[in-house]
Amino acid sequence: MPTVFPDDSVGLVSPQTLHFNEPLELTSGKSLAEYDLVIETYGELNATQSNAVLICHALSGHHHAAGYHSAEDRKPGWWDSCIGPGKPIDTRRFFVVALNNLGGCNGSSGPASINPATGKVYGADFPMVTVEDWVHSQARLADRLGIRQWAAVVGGSLGGMQALQWTISYPERVRHCLCIASAPKLSAQNIAFNEVARQAILSDPEFLGGYFQEQGVIPKRGLKLARMVGHITYLSDDAMGAKFGRVLKTEKLNYDLHSVEFQVESYLRYQGEEFSTRFDANTYLLMTKALDYFDPAAAHGDDLVRTLEGVEADFCLMSFTTDWRFSPARSREIVDALIAAKKNVSYLEIDAPQGHDAFLMPIPRYLQAFSGYMNRISV
């Protein structure tokens, strides 16, 4: 835990909760009569409101993207390596907004929130939300903050999908889109991984149809298994081999079915257990479904070029060689469509052994390229 914060840290930060009374119509046909969004901001909004950057989080992310909530915090925000003074998203130049999306479990309205219509926890009654719904709620957030146009919308993985959707839904409100380790839609394999994770949760006896909070229980077993499956897909074989290999946790093999014998087993169990204590099961179901549903080209005859013909932003896409969850080929699909649509796009494939999680890591070439692009953005 830091006693003095590094010079390149945004330091102590405090979240804000913004309440919205205007009904939000959702893709599903349902609506939210009112809702909260929890945000953090870093840096200062300039007089012309031209330096605002929106950070869109991935599946298990939230509003705490940088800095510390207290001097006792063991770790900073989830993208602290990229946000702060002198970092790629330089808070000396940019006003940075990070939020917890609707359906999340870190303060924004979601399944774990109180339904104002009933006075009870939403649970399974919270409506399905999509990437398009998130972007519409983020546009209202921008209005509330007095931001007419984002200098950049930035995200990795599911966050990159939101950044891409911003350029489609609100082309005039985004100058630059940074879409990192992402894809124009999920592959069948990715949908399959998500379904296995969902089934782990749904089959937990303590899930109780999504109303587990009313009974004072948590489907920890299902959440743990879901996270273990997901975590395997976020790492590359090289990364797992380098980190764990076949190293034993025990002195020798026990030749039974119940011992945790390999270090990699212990690691996955720890990650799953830790996740199950801080994340909401209904939120996990919603987030994975939002991933599955994302397919902006579906409304344009499955033609991604046509889908992107109306965008006005300049684009930067980055992918990582060992990412097999969202492989470089998926980023190149977007790049090729943008080129065919005659849009400005930069692309970098970064040699990194960490797999999908590389977009969260302080990899020198990645940070250098990220900084290089952000420094070109005029504010």
From Swiss-Prot:
It is an enzyme of class 2 (transferase). Keywords: Acyltransferase, Amino-acid biosynthesis, Cytoplasm, Methionine biosynthesis, Transferase. GO terms for biological process: homoserine metabolic process; methionine biosynthetic process. SUPFAM superfamilies: alpha/beta-Hydrolases. It holds the Pfam family Abhydrolase_1. Residues 51-360 form the AB hydrolase-1 domain. The active site is at residues 157, 323, 356. Substrate binds at residues 227, 357. It comes from the Bacteria. Its main location: cytoplasm. The keyword Nucleotidyltransferase does not apply. Belongs to the AB hydrolase superfamily. MetX family. It comes from Pseudomonas paraeruginosa (strain DSM 24068 / PA7). It is found in: Cytoplasm. Its EC number is 2.3.1.46. Homodimer. InterPro entries: AB_hydrolase_1, AB_hydrolase_fold, HAT_MetX-like. GO terms for molecular function: homoserine O-acetyltransferase activity; homoserine O-succinyltransferase activity. It catalyses: L-homoserine + succinyl-CoA = O-succinyl-L-homoserine + CoA. This is Homoserine O-succinyltransferase. PANTHER family: HOMOSERINE O-ACETYLTRANSFERASE (PTHR32268:SF11).
